[in-house]
Structure formats: C-alpha cells, structure tokens
C-alpha cells in the first residue's frame, strides 16, 4: 500500500521541479549566481529545489493520512514542525539575506516544536553518566535536542555543494531509517521516511548529473530537520534501537561540520563562521577530478562537478551499511563511528598533501590527452 504513495511523491516532486525550473528561468527568480568561493557552476541555476520537495512531502503525507485512524495527527504535527526550518531556508534562497544564526535559531524553534508535539528528543545516548544527566535534567536534554537538530540541518546544508551530493546522501539516510523502522515494526516512522526519500528522488532526477535545479537552503534545512526528527522519534519510540544508529547515518555531514570548525579555529577564531573552499568535497573536486583538468568548458566543469559526488556517495554507503546491520549494537556502532572519523582525517590529510593513491584520481583518457596535445601544438604554430 505504501508504495503507491511513494510513487505519487516521486511524480509530484518530479513535475513540480519541472514547473519550478521553467518559471524560475522565465522570471529570473530565485537563482544561484556562479561567483563566490563556494560556487562550482558557471551559469545561472534556480536554487528553489526545496519548494517541490516540500510540496511533494506535504501532499504525500496528506494523501497517506486520509482514511487512517492512527497517525493522522502525527503527520500533521510533523508538517507543522517543519515550517520554521523550511520557511527560513526559503527566505535565504529568495533574498540571500537570512544569516547563518537566524537559520540555526529557526531550526531550533522547529526542534522545540518537535519536542512538544512529537516527543522527539535526545533522552539517551547510551553513554554512562550522560544518560544520567539527561534523565535528571530535562532542560539539559532539551538544549541538547535543539543543538542536535539545528546542527544536523546545518550540516546537510554544508555538503549541498555538488550535483547529487546532498540529494543522494539524504535518500540513503532516509531509506536506512525506513529499513530499521520496518525491522522494529515502527510503521509510522517508516512511512514518513519513505515519503521524504521519494520527494527527494523526484528532485534528484533534475539535479544529477546536469544540475538543472539546486536543493537550496530551504531543501537542505527541511530535509536535515526531518532526518533529525525521525532519528529521535525512532530511538524514543523503540528503546531497542541504539541512538548511535542514526548518529552513524549522519556521521559524514556532522563530522564535516565539526572538523571544519576545528580547522578554522586553528587558523583564527574570527574565521570559524566564514565560508571557505577547504571542505572535503571541494578538495576532491580540485585534486581528484583530473579528467577535465582546469578546462573552462561548461560541459567539462559540469562533469567535474557531478563526478565529485560519486566519491562522497561512497561515504554515505560506508556509514549506512553498518548502521542497518548493527542498529541495536551500541559498541559496534561506536566503533564504526570512530573508524569513519579516523578515515576522514586520513583522507583529508592526504588530499591536502597531494598524496592520494593513483586509482582514486580520475585522469583523462588517452584519446582526450591526444586531442589536447594536438590542440596545444596547433595553437603554438
């Protein structure tokens, strides 16, 4: 039964994306310019992908709730809780004037609503001492919940830099949450996760590999918040699920964010909140995408952009597989989280030092090198 609603959400997202792209180009509205330290495209692209994702998410849950006796109010509450995060993200996409702090604050407001309406909170981490504090001090648990939800949403926004990167990552996380929810019999969380993933899938068709539309802040904050809420709901509603299962699922963007704060703080405390071009995905773009070199050709830049995402997709799968296999085994999940963090640091260090294994570098084919060589010789005559 659920798969019919999933298909509906995919189609809705796909066609609303098509309509959004057409209208945005006609009106020259809501676009992302190609200049900036974190820009890796060379033409005007609408960054309004959050609109079709939200419409598909909203309509999918609304349709699913019809005729249901259980869960209808929860669906309505989930949609209500997403509005602050989605709204502030959309404001940034349209005006480019909503700063980082207002976005974090509004996402925390959304998390506060989730605490109240959905009982979605961090009540345990399976860490001795910390769990005692969470049980004794509800205010501490609330603050930690707000920070966690805002942090995950912001982390998803940070990795939204290349075609298909954040879209594929979000689908993997939501699908993994749905798998774990189905194993523990939590139908409601499974349904919301599948509808959310379907809403992103319809968008991803337009976003990867040609980058016709970007997710934007509205999409990133919406989906990051939904992931955070579903993760907390899954753990709260099912005590057998380890809280480290969803943490491992979002380990890549969360660790990316924490590591970025750390490396910026080493340079200067004043630069912690300043954007730069030293995120892992940006280093991969510059140092592993040798197939098209430094070509300014639009097609070559597009392919470099899209191929970059393939490397990061592997990180998503690397975390998702053990999270689904060991969803109730906290020591194993902690071990894989630690392994990911160490692997990330090693990979980042080797990229900085230009010491990556040759098999990881996407080099130009022999025919392309020959063509480039001939073109160089002809231009020198």
Regions found by a protein language model. Name each.
Residues 375-381:
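Cytosolic C-terminal regulatory domains/tails of membrane transporters and channels
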Residues 20, 255-267, 271, 327, ...:
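Membrane-helix cytosolic exit motif
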Residues 270-281, 356-375:
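Short, highly charged, low-complexity non-transmembrane loops/tails of multi-pass membrane proteins
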Residues 20-46, 259-302:
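Cytosolic, membrane-interface loops and tails of multi-pass inner-membrane proteins
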Residues 1-258:
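"…together with the soluble PPM/PP2C metallo-phosphatase catalytic core" -> "…together
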Residues 57, 303-323:
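Hydrophobic membrane-spanning alpha-helices of multi-pass integral membrane proteins
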Residues 99-102, 137, 216, 300-311, ...:
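Membrane-interface starts of transmembrane alpha-helices
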Residues 83-99, 323-369:
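Alpha-helical transmembrane segments and their immediate juxtamembrane interface regions
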